[in-house]
Amino acid sequence: MKFFIDTANLDQIREANDMGVLDGVTTNPSLMAKEGISGKDNCMRHYLAICEIVDGDVSAEVIATDYEGMIREGEELAALHPQIVVKVPCTAEGIKAIKYFSDKGIRTNCTLIFTVGQALLAAKAGASYVSPFVGRLDDIASDGIKLVENIVAMFGFYRYETEVLAASIRHTQHIIQCLEAGADVATCPLNAIKGLLKHPLTDSGLKAFLEDHRRVNEGK
């Protein structure tokens, strides 16, 4: 399973990339706003800065909600850098735009997926990725992980090449569950990725090793 980091914060992207396990980045308008980035030119420069840090795919979202606007913005984003994947919402206009982009060889990430039916339409339109939102479904007492499982099974049965990019990951357990569900990618906040390292037995074992090493050296 690939790891993407879900942020527009350059320091966090660098930290995750320095771990040597980062495969890509996902952003959205909310994450860009959180970093105080506004205006088309500033957003474009920021996407380029992200592409300079990582080697993998970088999802950049269109703001327009109409077909023509999505096409215009998506083509501009795709022309910015080869790593850019155009992020498009799962709406009627969005599915139409994904089909256009697919025909033009422009890669897309269909976002805001909450049903298998939405994922099916995105895959048929030629999306490179679909992003089921695990945490947001859990928030309304639905089962986000089950959705991931069902999409993975459906894509496998019908042999769609679209990758399942599990999004809205809230914690480390979500990552493990997405792995077990067969997701191709999990896009996560930095603290969730780092959380995979944590276990009390690892901490206590390392402490014991270091203490034994100290005693050996003192014995010399």
Curated annotation (Swiss-Prot):
Classification via PANTHER family: FRUCTOSE-6-PHOSPHATE ALDOLASE 1-RELATED, TRANSALDOLASE
Pfam family, one: TAL_FSA
Pathway: Carbohydrate degradation; pentose phosphate pathway; D-glyceraldehyde 3-phosphate and beta-D-fructose 6-phosphate from D-ribose 5-phosphate and D-xylulose 5-phosphate (non-oxidative stage): step 2/3
GO biological process: carbohydrate metabolic process; pentose-phosphate shunt
Function: Transaldolase is important for the balance of metabolites in the pentose-phosphate pathway.
Family annotation (PROSITE patterns): TRANSALDOLASE_1 (PS01054), TRANSALDOLASE_2 (PS00958)
Main localization (coarse): cytoplasm
EC number: 2.2.1.2
Compartment annotation: Cytoplasm
Name of the protein: Probable transaldolase
Any one cellular-component term (Gene Ontology): cytoplasm
Domain of life assignment: Bacteria
Catalytic activity field: D-sedoheptulose 7-phosphate + D-glyceraldehyde 3-phosphate = D-erythrose 4-phosphate + beta-D-fructose 6-phosphate
Entry similarity comment: Belongs to the transaldolase family. Type 3B subfamily.
Gene: tal
Keywords: Cytoplasm, Pentose shunt, Schiff base, Transferase
MF terms (GO), sorted A to Z: aldehyde-lyase activity; transaldolase activity
Active site: residue positions: 87 (schiff-base intermediate with substrate)
